[in-house]
């Protein structure tokens, strides 16, 4: 909130895609000074949010217990990945998000190994690097085993 009071050109945006589990609904919100919000209203598309998405977002926003569990689970799983990367000497960028960006000597080979088991990671953002979206714990266990096997 302090940033919004201090800077008239700041917009803070949040998505419901990740922690709220509403990726297909394409819904989020923005906090910004009134003048910028009024301008955004003039350029947004009409009917940019359908009723189903709005109802789902409102229900998700009301379920703060679910959000807290999701954020906690994500943090625990991210810590497991960071520990494994440290153990294997894999360079990565620390993250508070639901993904980790990391280097691999054979990024394409590793991505293919995961893909053969049904897991996709984001490729091509930087040569030799992959972006791993933090998976559910049971999938994370399988993916970490694949990574260990791949690195040995």
Regions found by a protein language model. Give the residues of each.
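PLP-dependent aminotransferase class I/II
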Residues: 9-85, 90-93
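Glycine-enriched alpha-helix->loop->beta-strand junction motifs that scaffold or abut catalytic
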Residues: 7-10, 118
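PLP-dependent enzyme catalytic core of the Aspartate aminotransferase-like
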Residues: 108, 113-117, 122-152
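Conserved PLP-binding catalytic core of the aspartate aminotransferase-like
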Residues: 74-75, 83-117, 134
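Short, glycine/charged-enriched secondary-structure capping and boundary segments
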Residues: 1-2, 26-28, 147
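Conserved core of the PLP fold type I
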Residues: 1-6, 57
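Short loop segments at secondary-structure junctions
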Residues: 32-36, 104-107, 137
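Short amphipathic alpha-helical segments
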Residues: 25, 96-98, 128-130
């Amino acid at each position: 909130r302090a940033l919004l009071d201090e800077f008239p050109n700041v917009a803070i945006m949040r998505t419901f895609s990740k922690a709220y589990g509403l990726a297909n609904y394409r819904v989020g919100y923005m906090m910004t000074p009134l003048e910028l919000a009024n301008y955004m209203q003039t350029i947004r598309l009409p009917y940019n949010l359908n009723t189903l998405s709005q109802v789902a977002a409102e229900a998700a926003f009301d379920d703060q217990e679910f959000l807290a569990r999701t954020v906690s689970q994500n943090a625990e799983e991210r810590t497991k990945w960071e520990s494994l990367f440290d153990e294997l000497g894999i360079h990565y960028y620390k993250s508070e998000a639901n993904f980790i960006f990391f280097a691999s000597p054979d990024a394409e080979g590793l991505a293919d190994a995961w893909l053969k088991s049904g897991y996709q990671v984001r490729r091509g953002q930087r040569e030799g690097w992959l972006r791993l979206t933090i998976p559910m714990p049971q999938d994370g266990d399988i993916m970490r085993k694949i990574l260990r096997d791949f690195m040995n």
